[in-house]
């Protein structure tokens, strides 16, 4: 993926960058693999905001992605590489030899016309999916399951990959993109390679309106709100927050307070915390 830099024709184009989309080969998605995506704008079923700073954004169709890769020992051909508005990674359309079509996350260096396969007997080639126990040490993997047969849940963002560090007993040790080192059961499937579109993190948004297209609303500081809206609010002019330490809109300690639940079951599988 290459990045295109705009000239400063307007303040909105100054320093603005976009993807050139050179790897995209098909502009229209497969009709059998799309569905409507009702956007809730951060509201729950009662209309109350439960996730702040989320707006409507541009209308999108949801592409059904195969995170399970459960068509074992059936070869599939990569037909096209497409844009997905719901994620920063690209997606690849597969045509299986039995006639079924599925989308998967597009791994880096996987080209059109190549074949991929899933299963214990799969070779160690980019795009193939197999259990962690059958993947050698040092291999880069993505779309990793946390529980067997549940489907890939971690390492799915553009440009990310995890590395297999060790194998012992019923578990495989993985180093994640966050530098966290954790144990995962050896029966869990993972896909060989790194997720494509590695320059996604280098994109410069350029203007506020582009963030609104992406369903992101402005994040207003609590100190400039009214007292009824935030504990930091109120006062005359530029006044301090009036508290010994920052707090959330609901009065709980913020900035430096760890938010992960202590009695979480998965703590036993984390060997080194993320940094």
UniProtKB/Swiss-Prot annotation:
<dbReference type="Pfam" id="PF03947">
    <property type="entry name" value="Ribosomal_L2_C"/>
</dbReference>
<dbReference type="GO" id="GO:0005762">
    <property type="term" value="C:mitochondrial large ribosomal subunit"/>
</dbReference>
<keyword id="KW-0689">Ribosomal protein</keyword>
<keyword id="KW-0934">Plastid</keyword>
<dbReference type="GO" id="GO:0009507">
    <property type="term" value="C:chloroplast"/>
</dbReference>
<feature type="compositionally biased region" description="Basic residues">
    <location>
        <begin position="255"/>
        <end position="275"/>
    </location>
</feature>
<dbReference type="InterPro" id="IPR014726">
    <property type="entry name" value="Ribosomal_uL2_dom3"/>
</dbReference>
<dbReference type="InterPro" id="IPR022666">
    <property type="entry name" value="Ribosomal_uL2_RNA-bd_dom"/>
</dbReference>
<feature type="region of interest" description="Disordered">
    <location>
        <begin position="36"/>
        <end position="56"/>
    </location>
</feature>
<dbReference type="InterPro" id="IPR005880">
    <property type="entry name" value="Ribosomal_uL2_bac/org-type"/>
</dbReference>
<dbReference type="GO" id="GO:0016740">
    <property type="term" value="F:transferase activity"/>
</dbReference>
<keyword id="KW-0687">Ribonucleoprotein</keyword>
<keyword id="KW-0150">Chloroplast</keyword>
<dbReference type="InterPro" id="IPR002171">
    <property type="entry name" value="Ribosomal_uL2"/>
</dbReference>
<dbReference type="InterPro" id="IPR022669">
    <property type="entry name" value="Ribosomal_uL2_C"/>
</dbReference>
<dbReference type="InterPro" id="IPR022671">
    <property type="entry name" value="Ribosomal_uL2_CS"/>
</dbReference>
<feature type="region of interest" description="Disordered">
    <location>
        <begin position="224"/>
        <end position="275"/>
    </location>
</feature>
<comment type="similarity">
    <text>Belongs to the universal ribosomal protein uL2 family.</text>
</comment>
<dbReference type="GO" id="GO:0019843">
    <property type="term" value="F:rRNA binding"/>
</dbReference>
<dbReference type="InterPro" id="IPR014722">
    <property type="entry name" value="Rib_uL2_dom2"/>
</dbReference>
<dbReference type="GO" id="GO:0032543">
    <property type="term" value="P:mitochondrial translation"/>
</dbReference>
<protein>
    <recommendedName>
        <fullName>Large ribosomal subunit protein uL2c</fullName>
    </recommendedName>
</protein>
<dbReference type="InterPro" id="IPR008991">
    <property type="entry name" value="Translation_prot_SH3-like_sf"/>
</dbReference>
<dbReference type="GO" id="GO:0003735">
    <property type="term" value="F:structural constituent of ribosome"/>
</dbReference>
<dbReference type="InterPro" id="IPR012340">
    <property type="entry name" value="NA-bd_OB-fold"/>
</dbReference>
<comment type="subunit">
    <text>Part of the 50S ribosomal subunit.</text>
</comment>
<dbReference type="Pfam" id="PF00181">
    <property type="entry name" value="Ribosomal_L2"/>
</dbReference>
